[in-house]
A protein has these predicted regions:
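Bacterial N-terminal signal peptides that target proteins for export
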Residues: 1-8
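N-terminal charge/polar-biased segments
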Residues: 2, 17-22, 205-207
Length: 207
């Protein structure tokens, strides 16, 4: 498979959302708001074949489903702590990194913010002059509904958004290719990117 196809598939099926831990980390601790991202089966091996590895920094962690990242069915799973949801779902202190081992170039997505109301995921990108860029579009934002559950004993309210589908934001594909030193037009504009689940915990104010 040509490098172009490898990179397109790799970035088209990611999330995002980080150090390797057991896949059992998929469940957040009680009371800890979290964004979970999972790549499509085969992404890890495709990235490896293309010389691009995906990892996280800061408070985020990751796990691998399957035998290894080189296995055909291997999947990355990212667990990114939510630090606030007053102005978008914020992940202060967590970075998602694409690293091209062929040339040591990297793309960092720092402190990503999920704007559920507008259907956009933004992040600060140091390699783009520290600009805050629209990185992803939530393609099903208009139909994404919150599921709310309450534990009155624990005075806990849980708000879950399950199955947010993501694609590259318009125009960002060319920037990713350029920053990683990939051939021009390696990524199609608005390519499918993956999915994410968001779980928010808070006090149950309803009596």
């Amino acid at each position: 498979m040509r490098l172009k196809n490898l990179i397109v598939f790799a970035l088209a099926t990611s999330f995002i959302s980080t150090s390797l831990v057991s896949a059992s980390a998929d469940s957040a601790k009680p009371g800890q708001s979290m964004t979970h991202m999972k790549t499509g089966a085969g992404l890890a091996s495709t990235l490896e074949a293309a010389g691009v590895v995906l990892y996280v920094q800061g408070g985020a962690t990751s796990s691998v489903i399957g035998d290894s990242i080189g296995a055909a069915a291997g999947q990355y799973v990212f667990h990114i702590p939510i630090t606030s949801n007053k102005s978008g779902v914020q992940h202060l202190g967590s970075n998602i990194v694409f690293f091209n081992t062929a040339n040591n170039l990297q793309l960092q997505l720092r402190n990503p913010v999920i704007e559920l109301s507008t259907g956009v995921v933004r992040a600060l990108v140091p390699q783009a002059g520290d600009q805050v860029l629209d990185i992803l579009t939530i393609t099903n934002a208009s139909t994404l509904k919150a599921k709310i559950t309450r534990d009155r004993k624990a005075n806990l309210r849980t708000t879950a958004y399950v199955g947010a589908t993501l694609s590259l934001a318009p125009g960002i594909a060319a920037s990713i290719s350029s920053i990683l030193g990939l051939p021009a037009n390696s990524l199609p504009d608005a390519a499918a990117f993956g999915s994410a689940d968001v779980t928010l915990y808070g006090k149950d104010k309803r009596k």
